[in-house]
Amino acid sequence: MNTPANGSLSRRSVLRGTAGAAGLFTAGGLLTACGGIKESSAQTDAVLRIGYVSPSTGPAAGFGEPNAFLMKKLRATFKDGLKIGGKKYSVEIIDRDSQSNPQTAAQVAADLINSEKIDLMLVTSTPETVNPVADACEAAKIPCLSTAVPWEAWYFGRGATPEKPFTYTYHFFIGVAELHAAYTSLWTKGGVETNRRVGVMWPNDPDGKAIRQGLGPQLTKSGFTIVDPGAYEDGTNDYSAQIAAFKKADAEIFNTFPLPPDFATFWKQARQQGYRPRIASIAKTGLLPSQIEALGPLGYGLSAGFWWSPEFPFTSTLTDQTARQLADDYEKSTGKQWNQVIGSNMALFEVAVHALKATSDPKDRGELAAALGKAKLTTVAGPLDFTSGPVKNVSTEPLVMGQWRKATGGSTFAVEPVIVDNGAFGDIPRGGELEPLR
């Protein structure tokens, strides 16, 4: 077993992964060449320019599926502008595709900061996109809010410590504590008996490093035996060694945090080579219907954490839609099945508007960044509180466990997730019981 005994995280113990991209934004670098850094925007004061970066293409493209729907809805929401401090501002959202690539993410961040002169950056989905954009904003003193990355991978992965937090970059999402609580609740109370041996595939990337250092020790303390063949590289094509280790240990629970194409390769090889756990709880993939559909019948029975679903009993502060209404709106407008990124990305803009309205001058970068750090509100994704997070700059959010099943009851879609464990969040209703994979 390669999981360390110490569950604490430090800036040294988590792979920075995307740190090289931040070099574009150091003093004397690109920003200086483009005219330096100013504490307020050079754009017309009556216009608030919001940059939005997400992976719309590349390995993490599934996370960008809701973008067109959200951009249309949000631009309509902001068509009359925002009134802040007695002054009316028009709002422009400038969206960019990171292509699921850290270097591209850094480049589009540079363009938004230096050419578009944005006042606020919003960025979402995976460390490969979020971390380089956040690094760029911290260096340029641009307020930035992000989501859909485990907070430890965002915080420690970018070099922060409780003694030296960030000034301009803020984040909300789940972390190791939420994952640990959700997984152990499902694995012990879900009704599927196991030998409590967990085969893990945690990659050599920011997510994998944070999970190995944080989640592994906590699972061990909770009485699970971790079967860890070691970190693997993203893009690996042959998982025979890992599969052999899991079979030898009879790991009846499986957990992984891979890129979607990597999991598809592994899961097919696992079935071919005779590894079939009783429970498989996955993250970073298996979160979206398209990712499950791509697996065909092999996707049935996989479980995953859900940070948003139509069952969440919350309402958007921007559109006044309940979670169910927002999901139905998406399906009617696009013909596609809802996915949980809709909730987190809508909440991203909800927090942004809350912070903008809390300032006397939304173009004062320092004031806007401070307002993000004081934000406390209930969004369509649930309650967020940046004043009492696990560390400065961070708020966590609810997480429940769902299981993917073949759609029934005349559904127009191929698969459907069922909430099978709500843990500490009793106000989020369960829809069924966990079913074993074998």
Model-derived regions, located:
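Extracytoplasmic ligand/sensor domains, especially the bilobed periplasmic-binding protein
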Residues: 118-228, 279-304
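Extracellular/periplasmic periplasmic-binding protein-like sensory domains
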Residues: 151, 270-346, 358-359, 416, ...
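Extracytoplasmic "Venus flytrap"
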Residues: 48-74, 96-103, 125-126, 201-210, ...
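Beta-alpha junction/loop-to-helix N-cap segments that form part of ligand/metal-binding clefts
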Residues: 37-43, 62-69, 81-159, 172, ...
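Extracellular/periplasmic bilobed ligand-binding domains
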Residues: 211-311
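Solvent-exposed, acidic/polar segments of extracytosolic/periplasmic ligand-binding ectodomains
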Residues: 373-438
